[in-house]
A protein has these predicted regions:
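N-terminal glycine-rich phosphate-binding loop for ADP-containing cofactors
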Residues: 1-273
Length: 273
């Protein structure tokens, strides 16, 4: 590499500090995380470390804007912003599936909230192998136990859309969603939407508390443009504000009492009171 060359990675979840240990100029190393499908999602996360060279950051911003993408600068941390916020959304979907809630019902709850696709279809789109890898990185980093293992499906080559079958079978690049059984029709939790959405909101608060991103408006924009999060709701933080901060916290506390500590409100909520 040339003396002043910049090296960039498209990693979706690994801390940059773990990837740059053998570089002669680690301060010239940066993350440029694009989102799939690249042609449809305009966001690029620009990942920096505490000591990343300012010229490197400016060059990354210049590159991203020149290719007509939207840059979101965030601090190196497992999952960065978007994947960290998405992870509990997909995890809760797997837990609901384990409780024999129909896959279609899970996806419908999210779509009715305003998400572009449901979490089950999203896992199939991302690829079960990739989702499993990201989940493992985040679980190790944040001491979260794996509540649903994708390994059996991965071993059977059911990786999602790219192999023709994951949670759904895929025909002509579209998922075939089976109708819920009679028992599953009776088994749709009243709080299914909150169980899917509020963990994302809680994780967004954690990202702000840890200063992974500078402010809530940037975070909301990043989540909307990186995931398609119900745009009319303004992003996860704006959704909480519109719903009411105290009301949102109370809803999380209620879910925590019913389902366990994964719903425990993050201490960062204190900054919103």
């Amino acid at each position: 590499m040339k003396e002043n060359a910049i090296l960039a990675t498209n990693t979706s979840s690994i801390k940059l500090e773990n990837l740059r240990v053998d570089l002669k100029k680690p301060t010239h190393f940066i993350g440029l995380h694009f989102f799939n499908p690249v042609s449809q999602l305009p966001l690029v996360e620009i990942i920096k470390c505490m000591d990343t060279d300012n010229d490197t950051i400016h060059s990354a911003f210049s590159f991203v804007t020149k290719i007509k993408k939207l840059p979101l600068c965030c601090l190196s941390s497992p999952g960065f912003v978007v994947n960290r916020i998405l992870s509990p959304y997909m995890t809760e979907a797997m837990i609901l599936h384990k409780e024999n809630v129909a896959l279609k019902s899970i996806d419908n709850a999210a779509v009715n909230f305003g998400m572009p696709v449901g979490p089950v279809e999203l896992v199939d789109n991302v690829g079960l192998d990739i989702a499993h890898s990201v989940s493992g990185i985040l679980g190790e980093a944040f001491n979260k136990e794996e509540s649903f293992s994708l390994e059996p499906m991965i071993k059977n080559k059911k990786l999602g859309r790219k192999t023709g079958e994951g949670f759904y079978k895929w025909e002509k690049n579209r998922p075939v969603k089976p109708k819920p059984t009679a028992d599953q029709k009776k088994n749709i939790p009243e709080d299914i939407t909150d169980r899917l959405i509020l963990p994302m909101v809680n994780e967004a608060v954690a990202c702000l508390y840890e200063k992974i991103v500078d402010d809530s408006d940037l975070l909301d924009a990043g989540v909307i443009f990186g995931t398609g999060f119900a745009p009319f709701r303004g992003g996860p933080i704006q959704y909480a504000r519109n719903r009411g901060i105290n009301t949102t916290i109370e809803a999380l506390e209620s879910l925590e009492k019913k389902y366990g500590p994964r719903f425990k409100p993050h201490k960062g909520w204190d900054n919103f009171k």
